[in-house]
């Protein structure tokens, strides 16, 4: 059987993320220049830029795959191959099930790193019914993720990556590598090679082929970590940008609520005035 290997960076942020900086066109152009076959835009809780990247990826000779990094109740989760935004703040297992119901692939990003909203080890669902908090077997099991991000380029040391790899190996999860890039020069710094069986050339590979191959585990990880100095700078600026983003978002919501409250008060005032006028007229009618 013929097969072909494609290189994919499944975790990249665009300017649509609160901590991203690059438009999708530049990301796609750069990905093509460095030899990637696909790059998935996985912005935080928004899919507009990712859907655009999917639509125009072919113009750069790339495979278009939509995605998003969704905030669940237990941590971040990558949803690849979905065409709409998953519900936010839902349970991890419920979000995985939502992704599967729509033909997507669920990948655990930067697992166990709580400072980056990574899921705790005990909250990663298994499909074999094992309760890792007690070690008990024979349970119903939960919808399990399709893969674990075992190499993330934005880690200070290799400890978290090694821990993620051990976890994936222990529970037979496929592993992927990703740059988690927020700046153009880091796109593709870590990537995943995916073997696609039954295809003779990259040009014939579809998004569905890539997602199916990830699920089947025909993956190999490659890449290198970002420099420690740049990683430290990224964490500091990302925290500031996140705070600024939510401060602006909160201010907008506050203004919206104030305007809505003012309008409601004005409406109630008009209603009260009309009711009072009506009662006055009725009272005066007794003296006619």
Task: Outline where the language-model segments fall.
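Charged catalytic cores and adjacent phosphate/nucleic-acid-binding surfaces used
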Residues: 1-10, 14-17, 24, 29, ...
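Divalent metal-dependent hydrolysis catalytic cores, especially in the metallo-beta-lactamase
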Residues: 27-45, 104-107, 145
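Short acidic, glycine/proline-enriched helix-loop-strand junctions
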Residues: 51-64
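A broadly used, surface-exposed interaction patch
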Residues: 91-93
